């Protein structure tokens, strides 16, 4: 009887140990982050009181979302010696161009963006109301109660006039060299890249991503920015100069309140 109870207890304990959920390792948790195509890493971080007051977190260089993708090296193929000087693996056509075709290839994007928008609206409203009634006459005489003879005259005139106008224009020129990060099934290339400039009082950066056609690439390995599909171009900066261009948190608070 004692042996039966001991064996039953042993089986019960082993079953409970099997039902415990697997423990996730710290490496798996730390290696999982959420990144965006242009804005970069969106994971929460303790950036300090300054970023909390200005309600903005500056991007940093070396963001994993913008890291270049390099193709893996192919293993060397040792072919049998044939005695010929011609090697098919290293040959290329004399009519071949130098356009990018694979992951890791580099292409220069010429930035030539210019947009203009103008809108105006005018509104004029005018409404008039006029109502009157002659005195009531009974037997050739006006019917009165005291000094009131039951006559009235009402006039109302409402006018409204308003106008609004809005104009906006933006332009950007320059160039940035990006890399191919993916080759789609139809042959189109997904590109992505960034460029950072370090200044005395901060940094300036340009980020670009989108999809291009190999046929739109010029002979000098450049492509215009208006040829990029789903283009996302971001030009901004960090540091004191960028902070001076934005209103403080008190100014934003009173603007919202009004």
Swiss-Prot record:
It is a lipid-anchor. Keywords: Bacterial flagellum, Cell outer membrane, Lipoprotein, Membrane, Palmitate, Signal. Residues 1-15 form the signal peptide. Its main location: membrane. The keyword Cytoplasm does not apply. One of its GO terms (biological process) is bacterial-type flagellum-dependent cell motility. It comes from the Bacteria. One of its GO terms (molecular function) is cytoskeletal motor activity. It is found in: Cell outer membrane; Bacterial flagellum basal body. A lipid is attached at residue 16 (N-palmitoyl cysteine). Residues 34-64 are annotated as: Disordered. Pfam families: FlgH. GO terms for cellular component: bacterial-type flagellum basal body, distal rod, L ring; cell outer membrane. A lipid is attached at residue 16 (S-diacylglycerol cysteine). PROSITE patterns: PROKAR_LIPOPROTEIN. The basal body constitutes a major portion of the flagellar organelle and consists of four rings (L,P,S, and M) mounted on a central rod. Belongs to the FlgH family. Assembles around the rod to form the L-ring and probably protects the motor/basal body from shearing forces during rotation. NCBIfam families: PRK00249.1-2. This is Flagellar L-ring protein. It comes from Vibrio cholerae serotype O1 (strain ATCC 39315 / El Tor Inaba N16961). The gene is flgH.
